[in-house]
């Protein structure tokens, strides 16, 4: 979970978080400014891609973003969830869910995945904005209201 506030509406992808390996298989939470202005959650290693229909253009607003991944769930749409400002996002332009019992690149035990906050690979796709209270919790999926937040 993280609080984010954009500084500009630019172009291209800007990463709030990325987990990458040498073959560019990526797990990420980020924003896309190619005219979309969306906040997305994806993990190429397990074919996860959640891209909401909603757009987020307000440069004065803080967005509280929570993503939860639990691939042990039997229902595909319960394996990956996204909440923005405490509301679960259920309308997506793209919604690809991982297979059951698969391990994504975020917090991957094996492999050489490097985790970065605010960048894709340390030298590109920097997040142009503010981040607050970036928290990773492994082993459990918390409710989006387990932490206080303000918009």
Where are the model-predicted features located?
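Short, aromatic/His-centered strand-loop micro-motif at the edge of beta-sheets
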Residues: 41-64
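Extended recognition patches within non-cytosolic domains
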Residues: 74-76, 93-96, 130-151
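Short hydrophobic/aromatic patches on beta-strands that form ligand-binding or substrate-lining surfaces
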Residues: 1-11, 65-67, 117, 131-136
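Short tryptophan-centered beta-strand motifs in secreted/extracellular beta-sheet-rich domains
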Residues: 2, 60-71, 82
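Extracellular glycan-interaction patches encoded by glycine-rich segments
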Residues: 105-131
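Extracellular glycan-recognition modules
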Residues: 1-40, 73-76, 140-146
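Short, solvent-exposed beta-strand-to-loop segments that form ligand-recognition rims
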Residues: 84-112
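Beta-strand-rich, repetitive solenoid scaffolds
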Residues: 17-20, 27-34, 39-43, 68, ...
